[in-house]
Amino acid sequence: MLGVSLGARLLRGVGGRRGQFGARGVSEGSAAMAAGESMAQRMVWVDLEMTGLDIEKDQIIEMACLITDSDLNILAEGPNLIIKQPDELLDSMSDWCKEHHGKSGLTKAVKESTVTLQQAEYEFLSFVRQQTPPGLCPLAGNSVHADKKFLDKHMPQFMKHLHYRIIDVSTVKELCRRWYPEDYEFAPKKAASHRALDDISESIKELQFYRNNIFKKKTDEKKRKIIENGETEKPVS
């Protein structure tokens, strides 16, 4: 009897530990899955400064990158690189580019830089690989469709890591300007420094404004109308 009792106790002990290990494994697996889903919701914010907008002849001279979560909280600040370009290209820029890039100090910084386009792509690709899963997170920015053209051409490996969709703040801006002009009047004004990192920060703040003052407000109004009409709010499918 003693042997059976001891054996039973031993089996129960092993089974209990297995149960604990199994529960821990499920818990850790769920946490990992939740973390993966959260990372998939991140946004890759990019801003470029170029020598112009002609995709056939102009080049990238500055690039910055920030990562936010879906609520627009900044999670990581990536490289902010000045990319070397030949003096002939800088000399052939439009008067607008010469004025603004000269005033901001960017033209001088480009002439002094030793960073190549290939080195820049490697740095940015390494950064986004650390912060986002492949193929799931969209490119975000202001008029970012223009940046995307240059990135597709000059940094294809970087772009392959991102989702094919984009989040363009300028689209939201133009819709709000037309649909909610009273609210749009209070949108944050851009300082127009024409430096990549400053422009990204301004774009994030601008989208935060639209989210907090227009998207949220309209959602709250809809909920109030549903309650006033005595309707049951339908769950989102």
UniProtKB/Swiss-Prot annotation:
<feature type="site" description="Important for dinucleotide binding">
    <location>
        <position position="96"/>
    </location>
</feature>
<feature type="binding site">
    <location>
        <position position="47"/>
    </location>
    <ligand>
        <name>Mg(2+) 2</name>
    </ligand>
</feature>
<dbReference type="GO" id="GO:0005730">
    <property type="term" value="C:nucleolus"/>
</dbReference>
<comment type="similarity">
    <text>Belongs to the oligoribonuclease family.</text>
</comment>
<keyword id="KW-0007">Acetylation</keyword>
<feature type="binding site">
    <location>
        <position position="49"/>
    </location>
    <ligand>
        <name>Mg(2+) 1</name>
    </ligand>
</feature>
<feature type="binding site">
    <location>
        <position position="199"/>
    </location>
    <ligand>
        <name>Mg(2+) 1</name>
    </ligand>
</feature>
<dbReference type="GO" id="GO:0005759">
    <property type="term" value="C:mitochondrial matrix"/>
</dbReference>
<dbReference type="GO" id="GO:0003676">
    <property type="term" value="F:nucleic acid binding"/>
</dbReference>
<keyword id="KW-0539">Nucleus</keyword>
<dbReference type="GO" id="GO:0000287">
    <property type="term" value="F:magnesium ion binding"/>
</dbReference>
<feature type="binding site">
    <location>
        <position position="47"/>
    </location>
    <ligand>
        <name>Mg(2+) 1</name>
    </ligand>
</feature>
<dbReference type="GO" id="GO:0005758">
    <property type="term" value="C:mitochondrial intermembrane space"/>
</dbReference>
<dbReference type="GO" id="GO:0005925">
    <property type="term" value="C:focal adhesion"/>
</dbReference>
<keyword id="KW-0597">Phosphoprotein</keyword>
<feature type="modified residue" description="Phosphotyrosine">
    <location>
        <position position="122"/>
    </location>
</feature>
<dbReference type="GO" id="GO:0006139">
    <property type="term" value="P:nucleobase-containing compound metabolic process"/>
</dbReference>
<dbReference type="GO" id="GO:0008296">
    <property type="term" value="F:3'-5'-DNA exonuclease activity"/>
</dbReference>
<feature type="site" description="Important for dinucleotide binding">
    <location>
        <position position="53"/>
    </location>
</feature>
<comment type="function">
    <text>3'-to-5'exoribonuclease that preferentially degrades DNA and RNA oligonucleotides composed of only two nucleotides. Binds and degrades longer oligonucleotides with a lower affinity. Plays dual roles in mitochondria, scavenging nanoRNAs (small RNA oligonucleotides of &lt;5 nucleotides) that are produced by the degradosome and clearing short RNAs that are generated by RNA processing. Essential for correct initiation of mitochondrial transcription, degrading mitochondrial RNA dinucleotides to prevent RNA-primed transcription at non-canonical sites in the mitochondrial genome.</text>
</comment>
<dbReference type="GO" id="GO:0005739">
    <property type="term" value="C:mitochondrion"/>
</dbReference>
<dbReference type="Pfam" id="PF00929">
    <property type="entry name" value="RNase_T"/>
</dbReference>
<keyword id="KW-0809">Transit peptide</keyword>
<protein>
    <recommendedName>
        <fullName>Oligoribonuclease, mitochondrial</fullName>
        <ecNumber>3.1.15.-</ecNumber>
    </recommendedName>
</protein>
<dbReference type="GO" id="GO:0005634">
    <property type="term" value="C:nucleus"/>
</dbReference>
<keyword id="KW-0479">Metal-binding</keyword>
<feature type="modified residue" description="Phosphoserine">
    <location>
        <position position="92"/>
    </location>
</feature>
<dbReference type="GO" id="GO:0008408">
    <property type="term" value="F:3'-5' exonuclease activity"/>
</dbReference>
<feature type="active site">
    <location>
        <position position="194"/>
    </location>
</feature>
<feature type="modified residue" description="N6-acetyllysine">
    <location>
        <position position="173"/>
    </location>
</feature>
<keyword id="KW-0963">Cytoplasm</keyword>
<feature type="transit peptide" description="Mitochondrion">
    <location>
        <begin position="1"/>
        <end position="25"/>
    </location>
</feature>
<keyword id="KW-0378">Hydrolase</keyword>
<keyword id="KW-0464">Manganese</keyword>
<feature type="site" description="Important for dinucleotide binding">
    <location>
        <position position="164"/>
    </location>
</feature>
<feature type="domain" description="Exonuclease">
    <location>
        <begin position="43"/>
        <end position="207"/>
    </location>
</feature>
<keyword id="KW-0269">Exonuclease</keyword>
<comment type="subunit">
    <text>Homodimer. Homotetramer.</text>
</comment>
<feature type="binding site">
    <location>
        <position position="147"/>
    </location>
    <ligand>
        <name>Mg(2+) 2</name>
    </ligand>
</feature>
<keyword id="KW-0540">Nuclease</keyword>
<dbReference type="InterPro" id="IPR036397">
    <property type="entry name" value="RNaseH_sf"/>
</dbReference>
<dbReference type="InterPro" id="IPR022894">
    <property type="entry name" value="Oligoribonuclease"/>
</dbReference>
